[in-house]
Amino acid sequence: MGQKVNPIGFRLGVIRTWDSRWYAEADYAKLLHEDIKLRNFLKKRLFNSGVSKIEIERAASKAKINIFTARPGLIIGKKGAEVETLKKELAKLTDKEIYLNIQEVRKPELDAQLVSENVALQLERRVAFRRAMKKSVTSALKFGAKGIRITCSGRLGGAEMSRTEWYREGRVPLHTLRADIDYGFAEAKTTYGIIGVKVLIFKGEVLPGQK
């Protein structure tokens, strides 16, 4: 089962926490849809900013959104002008008071979501899939990853029949719950169809008492 389950969902409550942190009873469905709408909007709006993760915290009439990005300067803008514009756009989607917290991803080479998006972007630019995979694997290991696995599925290289190719280096223990494994998924929209890119990065084991 470790092969099929989402590595982040599998570790929730053990070494990972939820990306949406709030509690609701009657309004649960409404707030869940609102979260999805906010995430989709931010992903589309900040497409070129290298957004890795979006966390949403809610309390009464306030919503705090933490955006983890590789390029915080693009989101913040000159003297914070871009952030203010973004806040106003988000306020139209929800009736809550919005607080934005922009956090920098120091090593984008070790962030599975950013790596998968980078590989997908290269595939869209017609870079050979093996070269794109190998390049990302090499740079992740260079920046201190203990192991990495990249999987590409679809009509690779414009082949008639779709297939799955993967490349792994180092250790990627999928069953070990204390293993800190980051997971990312992206889609490359090529002229032949969509190619799915999955990335698993093993950063080491989280021992009891550590965060």
From Swiss-Prot:
<dbReference type="InterPro" id="IPR018280">
    <property type="entry name" value="Ribosomal_uS3_CS"/>
</dbReference>
<dbReference type="Pfam" id="PF00189">
    <property type="entry name" value="Ribosomal_S3_C"/>
</dbReference>
<dbReference type="GO" id="GO:0006412">
    <property type="term" value="P:translation"/>
</dbReference>
<dbReference type="InterPro" id="IPR009019">
    <property type="entry name" value="KH_sf_prok-type"/>
</dbReference>
<dbReference type="InterPro" id="IPR004087">
    <property type="entry name" value="KH_dom"/>
</dbReference>
<dbReference type="InterPro" id="IPR004044">
    <property type="entry name" value="KH_dom_type_2"/>
</dbReference>
<keyword id="KW-0694">RNA-binding</keyword>
<dbReference type="GO" id="GO:0019843">
    <property type="term" value="F:rRNA binding"/>
</dbReference>
<keyword id="KW-0687">Ribonucleoprotein</keyword>
<comment type="subunit">
    <text>Part of the 30S ribosomal subunit. Forms a tight complex with proteins S10 and S14.</text>
</comment>
<dbReference type="InterPro" id="IPR036419">
    <property type="entry name" value="Ribosomal_S3_C_sf"/>
</dbReference>
<comment type="similarity">
    <text>Belongs to the universal ribosomal protein uS3 family.</text>
</comment>
<keyword id="KW-0689">Ribosomal protein</keyword>
<dbReference type="InterPro" id="IPR015946">
    <property type="entry name" value="KH_dom-like_a/b"/>
</dbReference>
<comment type="function">
    <text>Binds the lower part of the 30S subunit head. Binds mRNA in the 70S ribosome, positioning it for translation.</text>
</comment>
<protein>
    <recommendedName>
        <fullName>Small ribosomal subunit protein uS3</fullName>
    </recommendedName>
</protein>
<keyword id="KW-0699">rRNA-binding</keyword>
<feature type="domain" description="KH type-2">
    <location>
        <begin position="38"/>
        <end position="106"/>
    </location>
</feature>
<dbReference type="Pfam" id="PF07650">
    <property type="entry name" value="KH_2"/>
</dbReference>
<dbReference type="GO" id="GO:0022627">
    <property type="term" value="C:cytosolic small ribosomal subunit"/>
</dbReference>
<dbReference type="InterPro" id="IPR005704">
    <property type="entry name" value="Ribosomal_uS3_bac-typ"/>
</dbReference>
<dbReference type="GO" id="GO:0003729">
    <property type="term" value="F:mRNA binding"/>
</dbReference>
<dbReference type="InterPro" id="IPR001351">
    <property type="entry name" value="Ribosomal_uS3_C"/>
</dbReference>
<dbReference type="GO" id="GO:0003735">
    <property type="term" value="F:structural constituent of ribosome"/>
</dbReference>
